Amino acid sequence: MQKQRLLNVGFGNFVVAERVVSIVNPASAPMRRLREEARDQGRLVDATQGRKTRSIIVTDSNHVILSAIQAETIGQRFIQEENS
């Protein structure tokens, strides 16, 4: 059985690292539209714990995950997870 690696997206929330397609900054208009479309279609997972959204994670199942951790920080965690 293959061991699944988990990516910490902040505040005790984890995502299966192999399912992550992209980690992006939420500031642009296309990312805001992506978030709204995901919310309307029931594909949005809010992992911010009530804090400001600082990154958006898109998975291979087309789910959109909001995180209060900077995209750069999650990216570094992703790289560390791949190397371990």
UniProtKB/Swiss-Prot annotation:
Source organism superkingdom: Bacteria
Stored InterPro entries: RemA-like (IPR007169)
PANTHER family: REGULATORY PROTEIN SSL2874-RELATED (PTHR38449:SF1), REGULATORY PROTEIN TM_1690-RELATED (PTHR38449)
Protein family per UniProt: Belongs to the RemA family.
Protein name per the record: Putative regulatory protein Dde_2720
Organism for this UniProt entry: Oleidesulfovibrio alaskensis (strain ATCC BAA-1058 / DSM 17464 / G20)
Higher taxonomy: Bacteria, Pseudomonadati, Thermodesulfobacteriota, Desulfovibrionia, Desulfovibrionales
